[in-house]
Amino acid sequence: RQSGAPLTHRPPWQFDASLGERKLRELLGVAHLGGYNAQDLVVAHGAAAALLSYAEHTQGRALAHVRGLTVQRSSELIDLPPATLRNLELIRTLRGEDSPTLLSLLDSCRTGMGSRMLRQWLVNPPRDRSVASARLGAIEQLLAQGEQPLREALRHVSDVQRIASRIALRQVRPRELAGLRETLATLPALLALLPVSDASDGLLAQAAAALTPDPAIHQLIAATLAPEP
């Protein structure tokens, strides 16, 4: 109510923990959730039941694109109540405006994906100092080599997270596929700009591994999509 977001009431049975656990197992194609370290999270199972039921209802189809599960425990994060977030003006001013806030001052991200990640980092800070140190270390490495070439390369990167979701839901538009095509073509240049070596094992090395392109996907999109859809 305070955020102004719409509120939708769901029936109590949709919060049933056993229903949520079954839905998660079916989505992930597993016999149990032990492999995700989520087998004993009864409250989370209930929340998942309602969330998945609501998403299936609004999308009008099964959520075939949900293929993974990441558990983030509250004990791993510093609890920032709404009043604290408001008083610190991390993401909203005391008047409820987007700027000036800590997020608005720090967010010079080139992509929507980066802005969303930065927001998550601010509102869900980790208790483990090594996590924050690793992030700062990666930022220092990037700044040390000069940020402008990387920012220029990121200018050609679309919001892949949202495009992937729209593809899975069969709602993607030709221009979004064109953006994905351009993003895939940009990946080699991005990889070349990351200061990593074969011996690297930090966050940038993880990013480099995740950004390794699949030429087959790029070739398929390039062959089937007009240059200017």
What is the role of each PLM region?
Residues R1-Q141, Q148, R155-A168, V172-P229:
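Charged catalytic and DNA/RNA-contacting regions of genome-maintenance
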